[in-house]
């Protein structure tokens, strides 16, 4: 069973599908958020308020929903697997308010979708995936 590891919805169970989906492990999620939270504290940065988290290969939404649980304002999910999308929507509706998430049914790598982000001074991209050049 997959659970949220921290924040407001700590221990909340997430629906999953099958062995095809490999959610980010709880250890990796805890490590990721611990690192960025430590960085934010050290540099006096407001980490979550009025911020958007991009879950680029969302699967069932573990990373994005973890971000919402910890106080992120909004999550944008990208997922293109039809079976997984239904589980992702179910998980989002069990945790998020309707205005806290958007789901794009797209393959991000081949997408022609353009998203406009205003007033972004810096950003980071984090992925457990290895890409071939």
Residue ranges and their predicted role:
Residues 51, 73, 121-124:
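Conserved acidic residues
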Residues 123-133:
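A short SAM/SAH-binding and catalytic strip from SAM-dependent methyltransferases
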Residues 57, 81, 130:
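Anionic group-transfer/hydrolysis microenvironments
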Residues 74-79:
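Conserved SAM-binding motif I beta-strand of class I
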Residues 50, 72, 98-100:
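A generic structural signal for alpha->beta connector loops
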């Amino acid at each position: 069973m997959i659970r949220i590891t921290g924040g407001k919805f700590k221990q909340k169970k997430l629906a999953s599908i099958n062995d095809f989906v490999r959610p980010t492990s709880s250890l990796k999620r805890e490590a990721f958020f611990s690192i960025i939270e430590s960085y934010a504290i050290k540099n006096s940065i407001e980490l979550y308020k009025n911020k958007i988290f991009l879950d680029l290969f969302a699967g069932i939404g573990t990373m994005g929903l973890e971000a919402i649980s910890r106080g992120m304002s909004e999550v944008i999910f990208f997922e293109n697997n039809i079976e997984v999308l239904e589980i992702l929507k179910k998980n989002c509706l069990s945790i998020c308010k309707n205005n806290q998430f958007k789901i794009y049914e797209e393959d991000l790598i081949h997408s022609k979708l353009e998203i406009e982000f205003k007033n972004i001074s810096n950003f980071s991209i984090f992925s457990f995936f290895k890409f071939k050049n």
